[in-house]
Amino acid sequence: MVTAISSPPDQLPPCRITINDPGESGEDGWVFIGAKGPLLFWEAPDGLNGGEDFRVVDLRTGKKIFEDTALIWNRRAIQPFGFASAPDGKMLIRYRRVVVGDCSIPKDGTSCWSKLKVRFGLGNAPIPKCTGYRQPGQKGWVFPDPGVPPEEIGTESALTYPVEVELLPQPLTRPIPGLIRCSAAE
């Protein structure tokens, strides 16, 4: 049984319960990270590109109503989800979405960026500077060099950007203004 606790209106309550019984969670290893009204938030046990898969389950029906990937790199430093009310009173969730494209911005430049802007609804956003790539002429990473080895220039690009989601009655995800970051996909 899960008991919801009160929290500030723009945050999830500070709780983490690992559920390892598929009968209780519906998915082995997912972690309950909080509740907001009738909505239960779950996080996957592992992630990529600085993000974690999360899902939202309607407590009233027990059905999953939404799933995506959010930037959750340091939960103690920053709350990954923000909550607000739309003018019509519906709850909005805000977070930094993590996606992986099917091309490399450093390698393919504006042709890749144009495809990704359309695919992810990023409008007329300027092309972001990408990190984590080996630049032409740069030496390869050699153990025991410090840091993370840079990826080849042709590695697909991962993007993080701010979105807001209206969950009910049907999920609707919209990019919102803010910084778009690009890195080499893991």
Regions found by a protein language model. Give the residues of each.
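His-enriched metal-coordination microenvironments in redox/metal-binding proteins
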Residues: 32, 44-51
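Structural recognition of the beta-propeller blade-terminating site
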Residues: 4-6, 55-60
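Terminal domain-start segments
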Residues: 1-26, 147-158, 175-179
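Repeated scaffold domains used in trafficking and secretory/extracellular systems
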Residues: 24-33, 69-86
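Acidic, small-residue rich beta-repeat scaffolds with periodic aromatic anchors
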Residues: 76-186
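Repeat-blade elements of multi-bladed beta-propeller folds
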Residues: 34-42
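Beta-strand C-termini and the immediately following turn/loop, strongest in propeller blades
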Residues: 4, 42-47, 94-101
